[in-house]
Structure formats: C-alpha cells, structure tokens
C-alpha cells in the first residue's frame, strides 16, 4: 500500500537540525552524560506516565488510541494519498525523538529509518493493519499491554463488539431477497465483506487484475465488488453487472476506528438496496 511511503532522504537531511534542537541543552554544561537506564530511555513509559506514541498514519493511530494511548502523533497527514508527495518536517523527527513507541506497518519499511534519523530510543512496534475484527482486537490487546493501558483496551473492545454486532445485524436485514450476497473483494477490504455477512466468491489485488482473473471473477457472477479506496484502479469487473462499492480503510484525523465500520456499512447497505 504505497500510500504511506515517505522520502527517507528528506528525513535524513533534517535529522542533524532536529537533533540539535532536542539535545542542545542536554548536559547543562557539566560534561556528564545523562542517565540512560530510565524506563523512558529503554522505550517503555515510566510507571504512572502516559505513553507518548508516534505513528506513521491514522490507521496505526486509531489502533493506538483504541488501546488507550492519549498522546498520539501522526507523521503522514491523512490528506497525503501518495506519500512521496509528503516532505517531512523537523517537527516530525522531534516528535519521534521524544516518543516512547513508534508504530508502523510491515509494508512501511521506512519507519526504522525515521527512528534512526531522529536518534530516538523509542520502541519500534510493528502493527498488523487489518480491520478484520479479530485482528483488530488482537492488536489492541497487544498495544494495551505494551502501553500499560490494558484496562482501557478492554473497555474499548467491549464497545467495539457491541457496535460491530449492531452493524452486522442491520446489514443482514438488508440482504437482497433475504440471501447473503456473493461478493468479490480486494484483499485489503475482505473485512467489509465479513461485516456484511456476505459470501466472498473471489478476491483480487493488490496487483492489477489480469485478463484471466477478470474472466474468472466475472464468471462467479458477484452482486458486489468491494474496491479499496486507497488503491483503486477504476472499475474492477466492467460489464459484469456487479455493483462496485468503495471501502475506506483509514480512519480520520480524530483517530476513531468505529466510523470506518459505520461508513462501510452505510455504503454496503446502499449498494445492496440497488443490487
């Protein structure tokens, strides 16, 4: 998902300036090094201290917030759909330098370089970005344990389960003819098919659909095609008669994950009413 790659050269060029800003008054002129044995220096927040979390995108940010983090800084703005267009600012590296945790996804290999450029001792945490409910709750559990916010994570999961069940039930009542619709979904939007209780008859992506795949998927006669809004290549199965539904994976700037499910449910319900 190329949406979240940033320019590493820009980051490295900024690192010297940023480090000067954040460390210039570090030794108080006494020539002694600071103690690096504190919890903060090892990447873990001090006892009773709320963790400072830096994330690459709003998706990781929403997971962190769900897990109980309150101090969350997003590096790549939500408005950047093609991250090479984003020029990192000194404030980005300054934020990483002060972080306890830096969250990234496995398809974002630049995260370690961001941390290195900032000279941060933060703990680098890989997050499995998938809105499948079971995977979301597993990540929230993991992060809550790391942050020391397990109780907050448990509370969020309870609310999430209730909202998910409500949306799933509402979508099932909208099934055309009372029957689970057949769908073809992009690999990163399969969670939305699950939310609708739909029957997945095929998947595609993240690479472009080949002529052979096009023929094979069209032959399955899906009622719906779920398209990843962040990686859309236009109409996936032209002339198939399937209704194409755009699914958004990334949360907004409020880092609230629940609207992602509500918005997907609204789009799915609308599509099922016309299929």
What are these regions (language model features)?
Residues 53-55, 60-64, 152-205, 209-216:
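Basic- and aromatic-lined ligand-binding clefts that recognize polyanionic substrates
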Residues 22-38:
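Bacterial lipoprotein signal-peptidase II cleavage site
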Residues 71-150, 234-242:
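Acidic/His-rich segments in extracytoplasmic proteins that coordinate ligands and/or metal ions
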Residues 116-183, 255-275:
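Extracytoplasmic substrate-binding proteins
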Residues 46-67, 75-87, 230, 252:
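Extracytoplasmic "Venus flytrap"
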Residues 68-89, 188-215, 246-257:
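Alpha-helical, coiled-coil/dimerization segments enriched in small aliphatic residues
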Residues 1-23:
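Sec-dependent bacterial lipoprotein signal peptides
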Residues 51-52, 135-136, 220-275:
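Structured C-terminal subdomain patch of bacterial secreted/periplasmic proteins
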